[in-house]
A protein has these predicted regions:
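Intrinsically disordered, low-complexity terminal tails and linkers
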Residues: 1-109
Length: 109
């Protein structure tokens, strides 16, 4: 299911402007979401509210979010693709107005 997609723990120490970008092969339609969670390392199924960043429609090859202001706190970033059980390589880039305020680590499951 959806929550088996790659997830990353994101800790933000102070307010920042973020933009998320993913690139992959043109055969894979991708989406990126950043959801608030209560504690570092929680998976997206533990989200406390709606996503603060969502790239919306799945797009092939390259997806970029709008620049968004994000408050300090704990978040989970989830990279998903349109087709269930489809896997592939991707490059994720997180751009921040203050890179030292943002810490990212992969959630191993």
């Amino acid at each position: 299911g959806f929550f088996r997609n790659p997830q990353y723990s994101v800790q933000i120490a102070g307010p920042v402007t973020l933009q998320l970008r993913i690139s992959t092969t043109t055969t894979i339609a991708s989406n990126i979401m950043l959801v608030p969670v209560r504690a570092s390392g929680e998976t997206a199924d533990r989200a406390t509210s709606e996503p603060v960043i969502d790239t919306g429609k799945y797009r092939h090859g390259f997806v970029v979010s709008d620049k968004k202001s994000v408050k300090a706190g704990y978040y989970t970033l989830i990279v998903s693709n349109f087709h269930r059980d489809q896997t592939g390589l991707f490059t994720l880039k997180v751009m921040s107005s203050s890179p030292r305020q943002v810490k990212i680590s992969k959630i191993e499951r």
